[in-house]
UniProtKB/Swiss-Prot annotation:
The modification N-acetylserine is found at S2. GO terms for biological process: ribosomal small subunit assembly; translation. GO terms for cellular component: cytosolic small ribosomal subunit. Belongs to the universal ribosomal protein uS2 family. InterPro entries: Ribosomal_uS2, Ribosomal_uS2_CS, Ribosomal_uS2_euk, Ribosomal_uS2_euk/arc, Ribosomal_uS2_flav_dom_sf. Coiled coil: none annotated. The keyword Lyase does not apply. CDD domains: RPS2. This is Small ribosomal subunit protein uS2. Residues 212-254 are annotated as: Disordered. Component of the small ribosomal subunit. Mature ribosomes consist of a small (40S) and a large (60S) subunit. The 40S subunit contains about 33 different proteins and 1 molecule of RNA (18S). The 60S subunit contains about 49 different proteins and 3 molecules of RNA (25S, 5.8S and 5S). Interacts with RPS21. The keyword Repressor does not apply. It comes from Kluyveromyces lactis (strain ATCC 8585 / CBS 2359 / DSM 70799 / NBRC 1267 / NRRL Y-1140 / WM37) (Yeast).
Length: 254
């Protein structure tokens, strides 16, 4: 697929894709994923062509931007590493997120509270989100999916080839997709300027690491408060000593 020069993959984005290990695919390859294989490493891992990945990101973004109401796009991730990315994507683009377990019947059973009638569905993993893809096929909803080389592609209309098992890879794909959608909608008109949002915001964070970081910040803050208290005490002590010396000198003069 040839893209206009405006949509060319920049060196910065290529470095991001490689740093996030988006190019590391599975050892097994589905027949529909063979065009996305760049080469096979000696250890058996297949390398994904990141140029193809970028082309599919642009294609998916153009499809998403063509939908007038952003809420008609549903972003789904039952995989833990993709839930934070889905929520951030929805917050930035206005899509409807489903992070966690997908309730069966959400697209087919209008009696359920979670019933939705989206115009487009985006999933993180065709295997873990198989129920959402199956229901989308029943009601003719197009599906965009982040697919690894061994992922099933039945009922997937647009497959974005990537490493959909790594937390950095998943977060970066959702980040680039959100940025491209905002650019096509005109929210980010200047393509030469970087987006103010960093990719790290889309990465999965372990709750234990967050608690540890919070505890360290509190410890540092308490340490600073202790140092300030010590400094204040020393200043008060020095002031008291000066006052005593001055009083003693006055008594000697008298």
């Amino acid at each position: 697929m040839s893209l206009p020069s405006t949509f060319d993959l920049t060196s910065e984005d290529a470095q991001l894709l490689l740093a996030a290990r988006v190019h590391l695919g599975a050892k097994n390859v589905q027949v529909h994923q063979e065009p996305y294989v760049y080469k096979a490493r000696p250890d058996g891992v297949n390398v994904i062509n990141v140029g193809k990945t970028w082309e599919k990101i642009v294609l998916a973004a153009r499809i998403i931007a063509a939908i007038p109401n952003p809420e008609d796009v549903v972003a789904i991730s039952s995989r833990t590493y993709g839930q934070r990315a889905v929520l951030k994507y929805a917050a930035h683009t206005g899509a409807t997120p489903i992070a966690g377990r997908f309730t069966p019947g959400s697209f087919t059973n209008y009696i359920t509270r979670s019933f939705k009638e989206p115009r487009l569905v985006i999933v993180t993993d065709p295997r873990s989100d198989a129920q959402a893809i199956k229901e989308s096929s029943y009601v003719n909803i197009p599906v965009i999916a982040l697919t690894d080389l061994d992922s099933p592609s039945e009922y997937v209309d647009v497959a974005i080839p990537c490493n959909n098992r790594g937390k950095h890879s998943i977060g970066l794909i959702w980040y680039l997709l959100a940025r491209e959608v905002l650019r096509l909608r005109g929210a980010l008109p200047d393509r030469t300027q970087p987006w103010a949002i960093m990719p790290d915001l889309y990465f999965y964070r372990n709750p234990e690491e967050i608690e540890q970081q919070t505890a360290e910040e509190e410890a540092v803050a308490s340490g600073e408060q202790t140092e300030e208290a010590v400094d204040a005490t020393e200043e008060q002590t020095e002031a008291a000593e000066w006052a005593e010396e001055g009083q003693a000198q006055e008594e000697e003069w008298n």
